[in-house]
Amino acid sequence: MTNLEIIQELYRAFHEKDYDAFLRICTPDLEWIQNEGFPRGTIHRGAEAVVEGVFKAFDDNWESWSFDIEQYLDAGKTVIVIGSYAGRNRSTGKSFCSSAAHVYDLCDGKVSRFRQFTDTKVIWDAMN
């Protein structure tokens, strides 16, 4: 698989909750950097920690959550994904939409780092 195809597979795995596939395409020491101010925003270290602390946690707080991809930018060992989040908070019933960029670094055919850039205020507003 190309690096772009690996990132496309990552989104498929997240969407379908195929956590085994996610673990296969990430380095064990994956660094997953979510915006400070983002719900559970911090640096998650390790692919297993991302599955537990990020992916599975979405179900606790959100009735729906999506990242709609508008564009992939393939820069070799880095792949940038431009899109927008949309979601509806489970406890408040409020919805939101926020533009975002995801930056992935790959090493030897595996995702080694994720960086997120988004407006976190609209997400917090939906939670309160």
Residue ranges and their predicted role:
Residues 1-2, 55-128:
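A beta-strand edge to alpha-helix "cap/lid" segment located at domain peripheries
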Residues 1-28, 127-128:
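Short, low-complexity N-terminal intrinsically disordered segments enriched in polar/charged residues
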Residues 7-10, 22-23, 30, 46, ...:
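Hydrophobic pocket/interface hotspot
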Residues 27-77:
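A solvent-exposed, acidic/Ser-Thr-rich amphipathic alpha-helical stretch
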Residues 11, 39-40, 93, 112:
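Generic anion/oxyanion-binding catalytic loop in active/binding sites
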